[in-house]
């Protein structure tokens, strides 16, 4: 795998609540320098990132219903619509985990559909299923619902919950959605070895705050 190929699989991420403007600017500078697929930031920072990355191939990615996923679908839809209007081209939404664990598949399906509809094809939708809170059976159901709702990716974790991406979960998610949907590994991917293990298991996108370090490992 070439350096560019790996960089184009990474969402260079900074979602800490105390992230400063200087840190966001640095994130975007690194995004430009290394050619990451996107920078992933909280919604407040979307306009600044869109301005800083204008004219580059680096997309702006943001979060919806983050990190708990427990808001109403209508609110998530408004968040998504606003994010796209301000320059986001990828949105990572959190499912309603409690509804899933309550057996309310209809709620989860409609929740995802609301966001897919809100972006109206102007942004990719990644669905965070928060694997650390789910049984394997629930992970499969969540992936099936995301696929049925028309999302583009399923994603392991917010990074704010228990656990993160594992090879087991990535392989399970890939088997569930097949080749036609993206799988994003996020949470605890901090080095090249882990990133390559996730890719080997079926991930075609990596969410990481350590994107620069991951690429450096390829050059070592």
From Swiss-Prot:
Pathway: Carbohydrate degradation; 2-deoxy-D-ribose 1-phosphate degradation; D-glyceraldehyde 3-phosphate and acetaldehyde from 2-deoxy-alpha-D-ribose 1-phosphate: step 2/2
Keyword entries, A-Z: Cytoplasm, Lyase, Schiff base
Reaction(s) the record says it catalyses: 2-deoxy-D-ribose 5-phosphate = D-glyceraldehyde 3-phosphate + acetaldehyde
Chief localisation class: cytoplasm
Subcellular location: Cytoplasm
Its biological purpose: Catalyzes a reversible aldol reaction between acetaldehyde and D-glyceraldehyde 3-phosphate to generate 2-deoxy-D-ribose 5-phosphate.
Protein name (Swiss-Prot/TrEMBL): Deoxyribose-phosphate aldolase
């Amino acid at each position: 795998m070439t350096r560019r190929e790996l960089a184009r699989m990474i969402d260079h991420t900074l979602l800490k609540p105390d992230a400063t403007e200087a840190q966001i600017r640095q994130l975007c500078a690194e995004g430009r320098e290394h050619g990451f697929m996107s920078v992933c930031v909280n919604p407040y920072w979307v306009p600044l990132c869109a301005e800083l990355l204008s004219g580059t191939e680096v997309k702006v990615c943001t979060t919806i219903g983050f990190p708990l996923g427990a808001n109403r679908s209508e609110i998530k839809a408004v968040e998504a619509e606003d994010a796209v209007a301000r320059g986001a081209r990828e949105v990572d939404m959190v499912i309603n985990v409690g509804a899933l664990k309550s057996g309310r598949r209809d709620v989860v399906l409609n929740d995802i559909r609301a966001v897919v509809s809100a972006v109206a094809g102007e942004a990719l939708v990644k669905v965070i299923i928060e694997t650390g809170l789910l049984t394997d059976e629930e992970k499969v159901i969540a992936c099936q619902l995301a696929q049925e709702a028309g999302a583009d990716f399923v994603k392991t974790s917010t990074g704010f919950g228990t656990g993160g991406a594992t090879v087991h979960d990535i392989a399970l998610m890939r088997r569930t959605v097949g080749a036609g949907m993206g799988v994003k590994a996020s949470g605890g991917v901090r080095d090249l070895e882990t990133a390559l293990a996730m890719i080997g298991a079926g991930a075609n996108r990596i969410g990481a705050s350590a994107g620069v370090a991951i690429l450096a490992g390829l050059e070592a």
